[in-house]
């Protein structure tokens, strides 16, 4: 018969209640924590059990070997070890090869790769001959195993029936009729501003390029100049020293001919031969 006291924690005595934990340093026995100790690490004395765990029990000066242990850098991996790590990552990433890696190692599937060590003083360049064919991407091995592969056949219009059903309907647009477009150009004037009284129609002419449609006559519309006046159009373009356009401004000026003398000439200079007289 058990008295029911097994496994129960004993009640703390008055001595344990009065005890208060005060943090102290192991090395200098002060009231700060061990990582706050101002003494350097190398001057601290190691206990015997720590010397044996490190392997410095038989040494005369254990601090020398500790400095040597901390000062030696880690060994860098060679190019062969890096190559084996990359091959292991690539083989473990593929789900098809992961199934076979449980039974036999990944090196069973890997062919022998003779890769020379990298040389930093010379850059390796791939030289292709003139008669060699260009590089072509090979298809994935999953496409070769599928009997319903569509690599050599026409591709599907959509991946799913829902995407095909919800696709936007494209309207079939017929090519514009040339005769119909020319009639629209006659009706819709290219320069429309103000009322019809400000415009005049010139004599119809036929373009030299459209010899097939000689019966179609195109009337040209241009602004009507008031009597006794003339318009002067000017355009200013400012370029910087590099030849880039900074600003371009166009303007028109109306000149009254009645205010001038009868024999006073008007000289208009066109730099780009865009004005026709």
From Swiss-Prot:
Keyword Cytoplasm: yes
GO cellular component terms attached to this protein's record: cytoplasm
Domain of life of the source: Eukaryota
Listed GO biological process terms: embryo development ending in birth or egg hatching; P granule assembly
Keywords: Cytoplasm
Subcellular location: Cytoplasm; Cytoplasmic granule
Tissue specificity of this protein: Highly expressed in the germline.
Basic and acidic residues bias (residue ranges): 142-156
Segments of this protein annotated with the region Disordered: 95-158
Regions of compositional bias (Polar residues) in chain numbering: 103-113
Knocked-out gene: effects: RNAi-mediated knockdown results in embryonic lethality in 5-8% of animals. Surviving animals have enlarged P-granules in the germline.
Protein role: Plays a role in modulating RNAi activity and P-granule accumulation in the germline. May function in association with CSR-1 complex components such as drh-3 to regulate RNA transcript accumulation in germ cells.
Protein name: Enlarged germline granules protein 1
Gene source species: Caenorhabditis elegans
Lineage: Eukaryota, Metazoa, Ecdysozoa, Nematoda, Chromadorea
């Amino acid at each position: 018969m058990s008295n029911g006291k097994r496994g129960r924690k004993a009640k703390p005595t008055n001595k344990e209640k009065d005890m208060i934990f005060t943090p102290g340093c192991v090395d200098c026995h002060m009231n700060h924590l061990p990582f706050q100790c101002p003494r350097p690490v190398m001057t601290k004395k190691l206990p015997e059990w720590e010397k044996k765990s490190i392997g410095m029990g038989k040494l005369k000066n254990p601090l020398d070997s500790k400095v040597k242990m901390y000062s030696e850098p880690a060994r860098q991996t060679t190019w062969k070890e890096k190559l084996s790590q990359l091959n292991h990552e690539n083989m473990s990433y593929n789900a098809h090869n992961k199934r076979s890696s449980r039974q036999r190692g990944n090196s069973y599937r890997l062919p022998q790769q003779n890769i020379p060590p990298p040389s930093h003083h010379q850059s390796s360049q791939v030289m292709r001959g003139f008669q060699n064919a260009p590089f072509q991407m090979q298809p994935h091995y999953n496409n070769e195993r599928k009997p319903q592969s569509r690599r050599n056949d026409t591709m599907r219009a959509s991946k799913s029936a829902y995407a095909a059903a919800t696709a936007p309907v494209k309207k079939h647009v017929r090519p514009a009729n040339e005769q119909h477009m020319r009639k629209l150009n006659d009706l819709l004037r290219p320069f429309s501003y103000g009322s019809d009284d400000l415009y005049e129609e010139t004599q119809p002419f036929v373009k030299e390029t459209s010899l097939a449609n000689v019966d179609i006559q195109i009337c040209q519309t241009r602004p009507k100049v008031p009597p006794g006046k003339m318009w002067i159009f000017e355009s200013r373009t400012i370029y910087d020293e590099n030849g880039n356009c900074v600003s371009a401004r166009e303007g028109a000026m109306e000149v009254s001919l009645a205010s001038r003398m009868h024999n006073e000439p008007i000289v208009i200079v066109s730099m780009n031969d865009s004005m026709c007289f």
